[in-house]
Each structure stands twice: as structure tokens, then as C-alpha cells.
Amino acid sequence: MSNERTAQQSDIKQLISKGLEQGYLTYAEVNDHLPEDLVDPDQIEDIIGMINGMGIEVHEVAPDAETLLLNEGNTGNREVDDTAAEEAAAALSALDTEAGRTTDPVRMYMREMGTVELLTREGEIAIAKRIEEGLSEVQAALGAFPLSTELLLSEYELHKEGKRRLTEVVVGFNDLIEEDNSVTSSVDVTDESIVEVDEEDDDSVGNDEDAPMIGPDPAEVASRIESLSTEYAKFKKLYAKHGPEHKAVIKVREDVAAIFVTFKLSLPLTDLLVQQLQNMVNSVKDHERKVLHLATNVAKMPRKDFIRSWENNQTNLEWVEDAIKRKQKWSSALRDIKDQITAEQQASIDLEKVNSLTLADIKEINRMMVYGEAKASKAKKEMVEANLRLVISIAKKYTNRGLQFLDLIQEGNIGLMKAVCKFEHRRGFKFSTYATWWIRQAITRSIADQARTIRIPVHMIETINKLNRISRQMLQQFGREATPEELAKEMDMPEDKIRKVMKIAKEPISMETPIGDDEDSHLGDFIEDPNVESPVDTTTNVNLSETVREVLAGLTPREAKVLRMRFGIDMNTDHTLEEVGKQFDVTRERIRQIEAKALRKLRHPSRSEQLRSFLDID
């Protein structure tokens, strides 16, 4: 393999040297020097692009002498640099090898994952701090947005009314986070003990998300909420009196934001606040887009003129009049849509009043939030990519449990992303130690939810795993399978529940399971279908129909037709005496007489003997 690659690099080096010397290459020359197994057009285009990037033009046919003379300034003075040619050849050879290696998604994923370097403890802390910084910037932006404070206060009121848990609103305080040196010093011992527990508790299905959180001190939360509410009321009062740009209003708004950022909010509430700000910014931009459309598309105002004059005039209701007074060729058209533009500006003014901010402040706050989110997302991405190998190592332990390996990796990656979001480096643990629990939880829960054809609830999966573990222990202890009574006593559960769990734990069997050595028959062939008529009944009914037709053929046509209509033989339904009478244009009584006469004939031994065998005689 190494010799092949060396020869390949040598060929490509000669090709590049030739191209640098003569200033061009043909597609035929490039194709002759590429590996035979390289057939992907996109990969070939990439290679030709790299050759073009070296200043070597690739032509269908060799250019004539005049063309070369015209391009002499670009091509004739090149010097063949062996080192450059070798480097380029190595790069192209690597590209070829990469292209022809494999298209297996698992191998491609592993190869790409292996290019990311592992993090040191210091690297983990650095990334965790960047995540914190990004999230802090997001919360600072939310704190500067008055409606965020209003929503936080309303959510706390719902908590006081018993409609929210405290941890659904506030989970802690950002200004009370301290370094715990004692925890940091015991990292190694704690990590080892956690890994040991991890190995022992392999069948458990964790549910840390549903576990009750300890949460912050309710009295401290109430005190801070009271301070926030007081400052916010003061802000609203000053805003109503002086407007958004007064120094006193800005000062109080900053005080409100300073208290707001001390709260460590729950993730759902943070997402709600972010969505609220984004919706408000979208509303502002929507009104601006409508004005832009009216001015540039309807009134045909030049876009540059609009942008130049519109800046800082979004809420200036005199802007349209000022633009019309410029007496441009689009002024009359602008006058026709003046009311529409003014209506959009008035809507923007209303948004300012609702938000207690200027439009410029709203946009700046949104810019701060987007920047913080991008910063945190980038750091989270780095942390996730650096720990993908941890997911692989854990997922390997859960193969052959009902999910494919790639599915296990995907579920483990979801757990890894949750771990990144919840990781607190100040507690002193290594990230891999903390993430292991989240990855295991995600994988085991996915196996419980998806591995079985018939889904079993997670709590029942836990019971089944416990039952299997105790059954194995008792099998080793007694040398035989444990009875339901013994399992019930060991697990401290009723015997009927043990039997129910054992019944649920059974795996479904495919109806296509072959039976016997020849495998011509399947399990489904031996299962009775109560909805299908048995072959015996089918044969009996067919014979009965044929016999009845033969017997009726011995009657007169009129008698046979009356019986057929009265009993629905070979018809969709039976008929009443009156319906049959109308058919024959006789009275009901006459039809009854014909029917009675025909039945007497059928009771004659010569005819009844043929039908008597079909009667069910007990």
C-alpha cells in the first residue's frame, strides 16, 4: 500500500512539473496520471481546481503557439520548484486516497471524528468558561429588555399561585457561584468511584431529568424578586414621565438589568425569553421591510436614497413629507402611498411604547443576544466534537440489545449535548466523568423505548432488568431457575405482578419463523384464524347449494321461483309474501298456498333424503 502511494505521488509530481514547465496541461494528461479507481466527477473537479490554483491551466486540447505567446507573461517565467511540486503531489495523492478509501458512513464518521484532538483538563475549563461567557452575554441582553423582567415577574406570580414549581422559574443565583477547592482536590478519587458504579449499574435506566431539583432558597428568591419588582415599577414610572432616552430612565433600567442577571433562570424560561425578544425584533423588521417595499418597489424610490434618508427616521412621521418635498420623479408616487408608510411608522412607534425602548435599543439588545448565543454555541460544538470518542467507547457496551450501532451513537451524542449544556466546571469533576452518566442515560432510555417491537414503559424495563438480575443470581445460588414465588419473596412484590412482568418480558416471535428442517412451513401456518371459514364448512356449504338447486329443479318453474324468492336462494335477500305476489300478479294468500305445496313436495322421502344428510343431528 505504501509503495502504491509512493508511485502515485511520483506520477503526480511529474505531471505538476510538466504543467509548471509548459504552462498548461490537457485533460488527457491529467486523466492518465490519476488512479484508475478514481471515478467520482466531483473529486476529479476538485483535483483540477487544485491544479488551476497552482497557476497551471487545464485545456481540452493543447493550445497553439500564439496563445502561449500571449500568455508568456503568466506562464513563461515559471521556475520548476521541486519542493512545491512534491508538496502539491502529496496533497493531491492524499485527496485521491481519501476519495477512493470508503463510502461506509461508520468509517467516514470515525475518520472525521479522529481528526479532532482530545481536550486536556485546562482545555475543558477554558471551553466551559467560554460557554458561560456566551450565556452571560445572552442573559445580560435579556436583562436589558424590559419585557423579560415583566415575564419573569409574571412567572414568579404563577409559582406563588401554585401553578409553577420554583425550579421551573429560578434554579439558582449567578452571583453565589464559588470555587470549591475541597471538591477540586478530591476529583481523582471521586472520578474512580463514579466509574466503578457505572460498571456495576449497567442495566439501570436513569431518569435524571425527572428527578426533583433541590433549587435555590425560596426566601432569597422572594427577597430578590421583591427588589426587582420595586426597581421595575420605578422604571415604568420614570419611563412614562420622561421617555426612553432620559438619563434617569437609562440609569434605573441598568439597575433592573443588574438585578435580573443575578438570577440563574431555568432553561425553558430562558428559551421563552429569547423567543419573546426574537419575535419583537421580527415585528420591528417586518414593518421596516414593508416601508422599504412601498418606497422602492411601489414608489420606485432608489434604494440608496431610501437607505440614506431612512436611517434614524424610522419613527419620524415627517419623513414622508420631507422626502416628497425633495421633488424627485418618484415624489408623486410616494405621496400616493403616504398613509400606508405613516401607518407602518405608527406601528413601530407603538412597538417602542410596548417595549419601553427605542427601536435602535431593541436591535442592539438583539445583536448582543445573537452574539452571545453564537459564542456559546461555538464553544459547545468544540466540546461535543472533542468528546465524540467517549460516546463510541460507551456505545460499544450496548451493542446487540436491539438497536444498531449507529443508532446507539446518535442517542449517545444527544446525551453528550445535554451534558455539555449542564456541565459546571466549578464542581471540580472532569467533563468525561460527568458526561458518562448523561450518555449512558440517553442510550439506555433509547434501548428501552425503541429496541422492542412492542414498546414497554421505562419503569417496566427497570423492573424487568431487576428481575433478570435477581434470576441470574438465584440460578447461580441454587443451580436451577427460580420459581415466581421465590422471586416475589426476593423482590418484595406480589406473585401475580411477578408473573405479569415475566409475561411482558417475553420477546415477540415472527410469524415467518420457519418450522422444521425443510423450512417450507412457518409458525403463522399453525395459528388458527377464527375469522376464516374452515375447509370442511366451505365444502359442506358448496355441496348444500348444489343439492338445493338439484331438488328445486324437480319442482315446477313457478314453485321453484316462489321458494327462491321467499328464502333468498341465489338472491341478495329474501322477499315477503306481498313482494312475491306483486312479482306474479297474484294475492298474498295464493303465494302462501304455492309455497306450502312446494314445501310438501320437498318433504317427500324421495327429495328430503338428499337434504337430510346436511342437518346437524346431535
Swiss-Prot record:
SUPFAM superfamilies reported for this sequence: Sigma2 domain of RNA polymerase sigma factors, Sigma3 and sigma4 domains of RNA polymerase sigma factors
Record keywords, A-Z: Cytoplasm, DNA-binding, Sigma factor, Transcription, Transcription regulation
Chain positions covered by the region annotation Sigma-70 factor domain-3: 462-538
Region (Sigma-70 factor domain-2): 383-453
Region (Sigma-70 factor domain-4): 551-604
Pfam families: Sigma70_ner, Sigma70_r1_1, Sigma70_r1_2, Sigma70_r2, Sigma70_r3, Sigma70_r4
A single GO molecular function term of this UniProt record: DNA binding
InterPro entries: RNA_pol_sigma-70_dom, RNA_pol_sigma70, RNA_pol_sigma70_r1_2, RNA_pol_sigma70_r2, RNA_pol_sigma70_r3, RNA_pol_sigma70_r4, RNA_pol_sigma_70_non-ess, RNA_pol_sigma_70_r1_1
Family matches, as CDD domains: Sigma70_r4
A GO BP entry: DNA-templated transcription initiation
Subcellular location: Cytoplasm
Protein name per its UniProtKB record: RNA polymerase sigma factor RpoD
Lineage: Bacteria, Pseudomonadati, Pseudomonadota, Gammaproteobacteria, Lysobacterales
